[in-house]
Amino acid sequence: MTIDRTLAVSGRIILQILHDRRSIGLIIGAPVIVMSLVGFSFSNQEDILNRVAPALIATFVLFFTFLLTGISFLRERTQGTLERMLVTPVGRGDILVGYFLGFIPFAIAQSIVIVAFTVLVLQIDHKGNLWDVVILLVALIGVAVNLGIFISIFAKNEFQITQFIPIVLSPQIFLSGIILPIEQMPSYFQAISVIMPLRYGVSGLQSIMLRGDGISDIIGDVAILAGFSLTLLI
């Protein structure tokens, strides 16, 4: 694996996504529409919206990043781009890391759109530093990008990618403390929740936005998410 080849792969991915209107719509349009619906649904329940906002942000960032990455990587594979690259001097490591670096800027932009819309338009109350929120989301994004790449290997078309959504996201939503606090779950569910990346994203955002904690207070959540991301990349 070389830096030049890796950057060449990531640069091609960036240019391809920039010229794809559907991808841009998924990055910017879809999160805004969904968050608008959420804000409208809780328009008369501001206290509830303030409490659930961190969990919603983490969930939507994971969901939309996973979807964007999975669909984009699948297109590369089904169109034969990956096969053509593998017969060149570009190695598998260059491809995987290059794709990761290519998707990351758009995923970060998407997370910033979600956070900005939530804070500025929906006007939720928050106590912590928003830059700490972004740092945590970058760690969660790393998991979502690599998870999307991994799952796309098993899909033959874009419809099958969407079929993986309940399998991938539903357990995380139920076991990350969004619906029921983890402490109130049966012990076996608590044990399973340990391997759910969304748990650490939700926990970290709640610490920052609801309690005003800093990045040093959630460094454990960030480290665990980075570990998940590295494991999926390998």
Role assignments for model-derived ranges:
Residues 53-62, 134-144, 166-174:
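Small-residue-enriched core segments of transmembrane alpha-helices in multipass membrane transport
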Residues 37-45, 155-195, 199:
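Transmembrane helix segments
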